[in-house]
Curated annotation (Swiss-Prot):
Pathway: Porphyrin-containing compound metabolism; protoporphyrin-IX biosynthesis; coproporphyrinogen-III from 5-aminolevulinate: step 4/4
Protein name listed in UniProt: Uroporphyrinogen decarboxylase
GO molecular function: uroporphyrinogen decarboxylase activity
Residues at which coproporphyrinogen III binds: R37, A39, R41, D86, Y164, S219, H339
GO cellular component: cytosol
One Gene Ontology term from the biological process aspect of the record: porphyrin-containing compound catabolic process
Annotated site residue numbers, Transition state stabilizer: D86
Length: 367
């Protein structure tokens, strides 16, 4: 630490590094915890912000992104913050129009329909400059955090981004995106490469701006079986990690732990553990002990309480957390949900989850 109390890049010195130490596989006094979508509509104060009304314009405002990022930390003793943004800012930066439709979610008025549509996408090298507003939000938020906890940056993985760009929004089947994989494999690989080439400088830029960890969301992994996943998702997941780490070294930036969260991708846990990430995120469909058997002791696991468990009583939440912690054990583990928080969840129950993790994980280490 410098004499003025500032760490590298002039940011305030980090006071709670429990999350980072767990991510790197080091011993911790308790199990760190954060929640996917911890900045969100379940908080009354979030619903009063501009983000609740005009989502993507909020994403483009560093000040407007900073506030919802900090809101959950004012309520709960979380061990990490995650920047308020969206995975779909990358397709936007590639030149696609994306709107947020109330009650429906993201919508692409002109999705990719033909191979020649790829020619309309911007050069992936310009994406990072188009997303400078995200970097500004990260720097501002890192300053405002004042070293309280680490700040996580994130992006969507190539396959997941491709699904939105081809489907035109969410889908229960991803039939159009998978149709591309079967009918246009070469064009699919071309699109996935474009996305990978856009993601790498974007993620490196987040670290340069102040992000202390990175999470890659492969939210639609479950729509691919083992064969399609190994062909169209896993190679690009690996390449993102490899290239980000190499570029950080080239830029003289310190390495940061990287997390891969492939929802419903339990069929590929062993491969994901060897994909170059320090942490593998789990959804609630995989048993902790089975997951540990698959990944071994070389990576940290993150997850994996069913988000709907937070609809239970606070007492039952405590029991479920205790069971989860017992199953994962105290080493190489970060507590989280198996997916994001839902808008109708009770903040008190989120607090009960966080408190239970801290309480039971300390007891676990005493025994």
């Amino acid at each position: 630490m410098e004499a003025n109390g500032l760490g590298p890049q002039g940011f305030p010195e980090l006071k709670n590094d429990t999350f980072l130490r767990a991510a790197w596989g080091e011993e911790t006094d308790y199990t760190p915890v954060w929640c996917m979508r911890q900045a969100g509509r379940y908080l009354p104060e979030f619903r009063e912000t501009r983000a609740a009304q005009d989502f993507f314009s909020t994403c483009r405002s560093p000040e407007a992104c900073c506030e919802p990022t900090l809101q959950p930390l004012r309520r709960f003793p979380l061990d990490a913050a995650i920047i308020f943004s969206d995975i779909l800012v990358v397709p936007q930066a590639l030149g696609m129009e994306v709107t947020m439709v109330p009650g429906k979610g993201p919508s692409f008025p002109e999705p990719l329909r033909e191979e020649q549509d790829l020619e309309c996408l911007r050069d992936p090298e310009v994406v990072a400059s188009e997303l400078d507003y995200v970097f500004q939000a990260i720097t501002l938020t890192r300053q405002r955090l004042a070293g309280r906890v680490p700040l996580i940056g994130f992006a969507g993985a190539p396959w997941t981004l491709m699904t939105y760009m081809v489907e035109g929004g969410g889908s229960s089947t991803m039939a159009q995106a998978k149709r591309w994989l079967y009918q246009r494999p070469q064009a699919s690989h071309q699109l996935l490469r474009i996305l990978t080439d856009a993601l790498v400088p974007y993620l490196v830029g987040q670290v340069a701006a102040g992000a202390q960890a990175l999470q890659l969301f492969e939210s639609h992994a479950g729509h691919l079986g083992p064969q399609l996943f190994s062909k169209f998702a896993l190679p690009y997941i690996r390449d993102v990690a490899k290239q980000v780490k190499a570029r950080l070294r080239e830029a003289g930036l310190a390495p940061v732990p990287m997390i891969i969260f492939a929802k419903d991708g339990h069929f590929a846990l062993e491969e994901l553990a060897q994909a170059g990430y320090e942490v593998v995120g789990l959804d609630w469909t995989v048993a902790p002990k089975k997951a540990r058997e698959c990944v071994g002791k070389t990576v940290t696991l993150q997850g994996n309480l069913d988000p709907c468990a937070l609809y239970a009583s606070e007492e039952e939440i405590g029991q479920l957390v205790k069971q989860m912690l017992d199953d994962f054990g105290p080493h190489r583990y970060i507590a989280n949900l198996g997916h994001g928080l839902y808008p109708d969840m009770d903040p008190e129950h989120v607090g009960a989850f966080v408190d239970a993790v801290h309480k039971h994980s300390r007891l676990l280490r005493q025994n």
